[in-house]
Amino acid sequence: MRVAASALLAGAASAAVAPQQQILKFPSSFSELKEDLWSKPLHNLEESLKSLTGEAKATWDEVATMYPESFDKAAFFSTPKPHTRKHDSEWDHIVKGADVQSVWVENAQGEKEREIDGKLEQFDLRVKKVDPSVLGVDKVKQYSGYLDDNEEDKHLFYWFFESRNDPKNDPVVLWLNGGPGCSSLMGLFMELGPASVMKDGKLKHNDYSWNANASVIFLDQPVNVGYSYSSGSVSNTVAAGKDIYALLTLFFKQFPEYSKQPFHISGESYAGHYIPVFASEILSHKKRNINLQSVLIGNGLTDGLTQYEYYRPMACGEGGWPAVLDESSCQAMDNAYPRCASLIENCYKSESVWSCVPASIYCNNAMIGPYQRTGQNVYDVRRPCGDNQLCYDEIDYISAFLNKKEVMKAVGAEVSSYDSCNFDINRNFLLQGDWMKPYHRVVPGLLEEIPVLVYAGDADYICNWLGNKAWTEALEWKGHEEYKKAEMKDFKIDGDGKKVGEVKSSGNFTFMKIHAGGHMVPFDQPEASLEMVNRWLSGEFWE
């Protein structure tokens, strides 16, 4: 039996370092190191810890004593990924942010103003036309390439697939996997993309791909994830949001035929952090070429204080599936939760490193650790883990495919190798306190402007449906009371009437539970997943 090394947990369970015990160091082997970029996270941590109170230091000491291995494993930040940048002549298009930023227009008052908001001068977008016949992923028009942040030396890889239906009118969707530190190309080839990778390395057509009625962009972010790379690092969600705005702005500038169509951000897991912040960043720019219409968060981590309370019920048979843990383990989790909740509350109050890191370490060990040690799949309570570190053998098939030289050449990948998940990134985010920060507080502002869908497969443990339903009902916003009172109704496939889940909706807020779906709903329930997406994008649940 294999113990699951959850992407959402592996870094968190070993990601912090007590300042009084360890000295954070750089890795010994660096390629093209820009030391100032790598020193920023350490400097920020040092500055945050200067204000460490006696009470906070006692908390650090307490959690470090309880879980010493978790604190000892993060003395190093990750090493930059080896890469070779291609000459500009090898790309079909290059969009320079400085050129976009230099365009001025006259407003209604006769005053000159920039056509598009934002700080874009440091960004470029490189674009490659992908020949569909070379790889056989899909027959539709495809583009891949990099968003380059020349100031911070960051390079984010993307892969765009046009809609199979009506690309001139169909919406555009951005897909983000979580981790933090897992490649969105996993989502492409394992969940919602045009094809999946089989054990023999061959591709299998996906009839339920989300590009059935929408064009989809898969983005490897943050840097040093998948085909993306940097000599520096990103270790918090807010910093990553600036990159997303630049990517979309330059992409839609190069391809204006997509810019007027409805645009939606979707993702799963730690994307429950990313998506509210990324959407808020886009909406903060009033002069933009991004027609953001909604967001979709699948089995996300968004409000830790509410969600962590529901690990014990899900593990102990109260989530609709048989119990995974015995009574003594369930009782131990009950006993541990009050301390966990207290630590998260402290994090919510200060949003500082010194309060948020101990909360993550304690709560992940106390509330997720007992389940993880059983060897059961943290992404699906019905199954044991497979041989892969992340429980699914399909991840190995995908990695092998994306490491083929002909594949990397076809899409213009510049890194020496592809990894599905980078656990160092996971630890970096936690070490900066990002893990437990209250990003759900951004959601009420989003609901003022756009619809928000939170969906969850009902067999997931790591970001389970109980916790996701609970945080949406606890969220304070102007439609809170009406949403909380809204009843769950059957969600059925149009045509045959097959029940595939339940849904509740009020105002701009919708929650959906997908039956027999794990952490990755499109993987477990592809038909129900596409039904959900098609009907959501059509505006069926919006008010």
Curated annotation (Swiss-Prot):
<comment type="function">
    <text>Vacuolar carboxypeptidase involved in degradation of small peptides. Digests preferentially peptides containing an aliphatic or hydrophobic residue in P1' position, as well as methionine, leucine or phenylalanine in P1 position of ester substrate.</text>
</comment>
<keyword id="KW-1015">Disulfide bond</keyword>
<feature type="glycosylation site" description="N-linked (GlcNAc...) asparagine">
    <location>
        <position position="213"/>
    </location>
</feature>
<keyword id="KW-0645">Protease</keyword>
<keyword id="KW-0865">Zymogen</keyword>
<dbReference type="Pfam" id="PF05388">
    <property type="entry name" value="Carbpep_Y_N"/>
</dbReference>
<feature type="active site">
    <location>
        <position position="460"/>
    </location>
</feature>
<feature type="disulfide bond">
    <location>
        <begin position="347"/>
        <end position="356"/>
    </location>
</feature>
<feature type="active site">
    <location>
        <position position="519"/>
    </location>
</feature>
<dbReference type="InterPro" id="IPR018202">
    <property type="entry name" value="Ser_caboxypep_ser_AS"/>
</dbReference>
<feature type="disulfide bond">
    <location>
        <begin position="316"/>
        <end position="330"/>
    </location>
</feature>
<dbReference type="GO" id="GO:0004185">
    <property type="term" value="F:serine-type carboxypeptidase activity"/>
</dbReference>
<dbReference type="InterPro" id="IPR029058">
    <property type="entry name" value="AB_hydrolase_fold"/>
</dbReference>
<keyword id="KW-0732">Signal</keyword>
<keyword id="KW-0926">Vacuole</keyword>
<feature type="disulfide bond">
    <location>
        <begin position="385"/>
        <end position="391"/>
    </location>
</feature>
<feature type="disulfide bond">
    <location>
        <begin position="340"/>
        <end position="363"/>
    </location>
</feature>
<dbReference type="InterPro" id="IPR001563">
    <property type="entry name" value="Peptidase_S10"/>
</dbReference>
<dbReference type="GO" id="GO:0000324">
    <property type="term" value="C:fungal-type vacuole"/>
</dbReference>
<dbReference type="Pfam" id="PF00450">
    <property type="entry name" value="Peptidase_S10"/>
</dbReference>
<feature type="glycosylation site" description="N-linked (GlcNAc...) asparagine">
    <location>
        <position position="508"/>
    </location>
</feature>
<keyword id="KW-0121">Carboxypeptidase</keyword>
<feature type="disulfide bond">
    <location>
        <begin position="182"/>
        <end position="421"/>
    </location>
</feature>
<comment type="similarity">
    <text>Belongs to the peptidase S10 family.</text>
</comment>
<feature type="active site">
    <location>
        <position position="269"/>
    </location>
</feature>
<protein>
    <recommendedName>
        <fullName>Carboxypeptidase Y homolog A</fullName>
        <ecNumber>3.4.16.5</ecNumber>
    </recommendedName>
</protein>
<feature type="propeptide">
    <location>
        <begin position="18"/>
        <end position="128"/>
    </location>
</feature>
<keyword id="KW-0325">Glycoprotein</keyword>
<feature type="signal peptide">
    <location>
        <begin position="1"/>
        <end position="17"/>
    </location>
</feature>
<dbReference type="GO" id="GO:0006508">
    <property type="term" value="P:proteolysis"/>
</dbReference>
<keyword id="KW-0378">Hydrolase</keyword>
<dbReference type="InterPro" id="IPR008442">
    <property type="entry name" value="Propeptide_carboxypepY"/>
</dbReference>
